[in-house]
From Swiss-Prot:
InterPro entries in the record: GBX-1/2, HD, HD_metazoa, Homeobox_CS, Homeodomain-like_sf
Start-end of Gly residues biased regions: 305-316
Keyword Transcription regulation: yes
Biased segments, Polar residues type: 254-264
Start-end of DNA-binding region: 323-382
Name of the gene: unpg
Protein name: Homeobox protein unplugged
Keywords of the record: DNA-binding, Homeobox, Nucleus, Transcription, Transcription regulation
Species this protein is from: Drosophila pseudoobscura pseudoobscura
Function, as annotated: Plays a regulatory role in neural branching of the tracheae: segment-specific aspects of these neural branching patterns appear to be generated by homeotic regulation of expression.
Cellular localisation: Nucleus
A single GO BP: regulation of DNA-templated transcription
GO molecular function annotation: DNA-binding transcription factor activity; DNA-binding transcription factor activity, RNA polymerase II-specific; RNA polymerase II transcription regulatory region sequence-specific DNA binding
Main location: nucleus
C-alpha cells in the first residue's frame, strides 16, 4: 500500500496487462471503490492491447491514439494516487482499510502498472524509463477522457489542491477535471471529503462563472451516504451547509438527515402555539366550571368586595395564564335583577339559570359564578351573626344586613329596589317564600319573636319585629316593618 511499491509495480506496464485482466475479474460484485476501478481497468487494458496489435496507421491517427492512451494512464495514475492518500482520520476509512487490506493491496499491485511511464514519453508503455509519478501540471494539460468513463474514480483532495495551485484561470483541461470531480462518484465519499471538495470547487467558481455548482452540490448534500456514520453528519466542521434546523440533541442517520430535518424543524414552534391555544381555550372553558364549591370563592370575594363582579371565579386558570382576565362589570340593572333572584331562590336550576342569563344578556357561567359568590357571602354573614349571639340576645339591630354596593351602581335605584322587595314581601311574596313557619324550622331569632307573640299567630308572615326586648306588649306597638320572610331569606 506504500507509494514505492506502487512505483516498482508500475515499471511492468505493458507486460502485466493480461494479469491485470485476470485479477480484476476475481474482485467481488458488491458496490465498492475497488469494484468500480476494476470495471474501468479492463477498458484501458483493451485499449493498450489494441494499440499494440493494430497495424501501422497514419501519423495523425497514431498521435491521437497516443494522446488517448496517455490520458487514460494519467487518470489511472491519479486514481491510484488517490487511493494511497485517503484521509485516514476518517472513521469510515479506518475501518474500511482494516477490513479490506488484502484486497486493496492486491488491486493496487495489479492495477498500478500504469504509474511507471511519464506522460511526456510517447513510448512509455513499451520502454519504461522513469519510475516517478507524473507532476500535477502534466495531468492538467493532458486531454481528459469523457466524463462518463471516469466518473467513478475516487477523489483526492490534496491532488486537486495541488492542481488548483498549478493551473491557470484559462485552463480548459482543469475545468474539465473539476467537472469530473463533481460527478456522482462523490456520493461514495465521506462528508469530510465532500466538504474539502466543495472548498476546492469554490475556487473554481471564480474562474468559471458560467458553470454553476449549486445544482451539483444540492443533490450531493441531500442524497444519502450509506457508508458515512451519523456523527459525521451532525458534527462536521462546515456544519451550516448541512444544518437545516435539526435540534442539537437530536441525532439522525445519514440516509434520513435531510428529510427529517426539513420536516421536524418548524415542528416545536407550531406545537408550542397549538399547545398555548388549547391551554388558553381549556382555561377559558373550564375555569368557571371548576369552582362548583361555594366555599372556593371566598378569596375572590375578599379581594373584590363584591363577589358578583368577578365572573371567572377560580384562581388556578388566571395564575396559569400570562395575563389576568378582566372582571365582568355588571350594570345596575343586572345587579338588581340578580339580587332579586337571589332573595327569591338561593340555588338555581339549569333552566332558571339559562332564563336569567338570556334576560340579562349574560352567559350562564357568569350567572353561576355570581350566585356562588353571593352564597359564599351569605354564609359568612350568617355565620358571623350566629357567632356574635345576636339570635340569643334578640337585638333588632342584627336583623338589618348591610350589603356593600359597588361605586358604579346607583344607590337610589338600590334603595327603591329594596323598598319594592319589602312591599312585595308584605303584600304577597313568591310561592317559594310562602312557607309555614314550624317550630323545628325556626331559627333562634324567629323562635324568640314567636314566643313574644304569645303563640297567637305563629304562622303569620307579617308579624313585626320588636325594636328591643322591653316587653311583649311593646313588640307589637313599636314594630319595624321588616318581615320575617325577608329576614329568613337573607339568613
Amino acid at each position: 500500500m506504500e507509494r514505492p511499491a506502487l512505483l516498482q509495480n508500475g515499471e511492468h506496464g505493458a507486460v502485466g496487462s493480461l494479469e491485470t485482466k485476470t485479477t480484476t475479474r476475481l474482485m467481488p460484485k458488491p458496490f465498492s471503490i475497488e469494484s468500480l476501478i476494476a470495471t474501468q481497468t479492463p477498458a484501458t487494458v483493451s485499449a493498450s492491447a489494441s494499440i499494440a496489435a493494430s497495424p501501422p496507421s497514419p501519423p495523425e491517427d497514431h498521435e491521437q491514439e497516443q494522446e488517448q492512451e496517455l490520458s487514460a494512464r494519467a487518470m489511472v495514475a491519479s486514481s491510484a494516487l488517490g487511493l494511497t492518500q485517503f484521509p485516514l482520520y476518517n472513521p469510515w476509512l479506518h475501518g474500511y482499510f482494516a477490513q479490506n487490506h488484502e484486497r486493496l493491496t492486491h488491486l493496487i499491485a495489479g492495477g498500478g502498472c500504469y504509474l511507471g511511464s511519464p506522460v511526456g514519453n510517447p513510448f512509455a508503455g513499451k520502454e519504461p524509463s522513469h519510475p516517478h509519478p507524473p507532476p500535477p501540471h502534466a495531468l492538467d494539460k493532458s486531454p481528459l477522457p469523457h466524463p462518463l468513463d471516469t466518473r467513478f474514480l475516487p477523489f483526492n483532495a490534496s491532488a486537486a489542491a495541488a492542481a488548483a495551485s498549478a493551473a491557470t484561470p484559462t485552463d480548459l483541461s482543469y475545468r474539465r477535471l473539476a467537472e469530473l470531480m463533481n460527478q456522482d462518484y462523490v456520493h461514495n465519499l465521506s462528508v469530510n471529503a465532500r466538504l474539502q471538495h466543495m472548498a476546492v470547487a469554490g475556487r473554481l467558481q471564480e474562474d468559471h462563472p458560467s458553470h454553476s455548482l449549486m445544482h451539483l452540490q444540492e443533490p450531493m448534500l441531500l442524497q444519502a451516504n450509506p457508508f458515512s456514520p451519523a456523527k459525521s453528519v451532525s458534527h462536521s466542521p462546515v456544519e451550516p451547509t448541512l444544518d437545516v434546523g435539526v435540534d442539537e440533541d437530536y441525532e439522525c442517520s445519514g440516509d434520513s438527515s435531510s428529510d427529517i430535518s426539513l420536516t421536524l424543524s418548524p415542528m416545536p414552534r407550531n406545537c408550542n402555539r397549538e399547545l398555548d391555544k388549547s391551554r388558553n381555550g381549556a382555561y377559558t372553558n373550564s375555569d368557571s366550571e371548576d369552582c362548583s364549591d361555594d366555599e372556593g370563592a371566598h378569596s375572590h370575594h375578599d379581594a373584590s368586595g363584591l363577589g358578583g363582579k368577578d365572573s371567572q371565579g377560580n384562581g388556578s386558570g388566571s395564575s396559569s395564564s400570562k395575563s389576568r382576565r378582566r372582571r365582568t362589570a355588571f350594570t345596575s340593572e343586572q345587579l338588581l335583577e340578580l339580587e332579586r333572584e337571589f332573595h327569591a331562590k338561593k340555588y338555581l336550576s339549569l333552566t332558571e339559570r339559562s332564563q336569567i342569563a338570556t334576560s340579562l344578556k349574560l352567559s350562564e357561567v357568569q350567572v353561576k359564578i355570581w350566585f356562588q359568590n353571593r352564597r359564599a357571602k351569605w354564609k359568612r354573614v350568617k355565620a358571623g351573626l350566629t357567632s356574635h349571639g345576636l339570635g340569643r340576645n334578640g337585638s333588632a339591630s342584627g336583623t338589618k344586613i348591610v350589603v356593600p354596593i359597588p361605586v358604579h351602581v346607583n344607590r337610589f335605584a338600590v334603595r327603591s329596589q329594596h323598598q319594592q322587595l319589602e312591599k312585595m314581601c308584605l303584600s304577597g311574596p313568591k310561592p317559594d317564600l310562602r312557607k309555614k313557619l314550624s317550630t323545628e324550622a325556626m331559627s333562634g331569632f324567629e323562635k324568640f319573636n314567636g314566643g313574644g307573640l304569645g303563640g297567637s299567630a305563629p304562622s303569620s308572615s307579617t308579624a313585626s319585629v320588636g325594636a328591643g326586648s322591653v316587653g311583649m306588649g311593646l313588640a307589637l306597638g313599636i314594630g319595624v316593618t321588616t318581615p320575617l320572610s325577608l329576614g329568613r331569606s337573607i339568613y
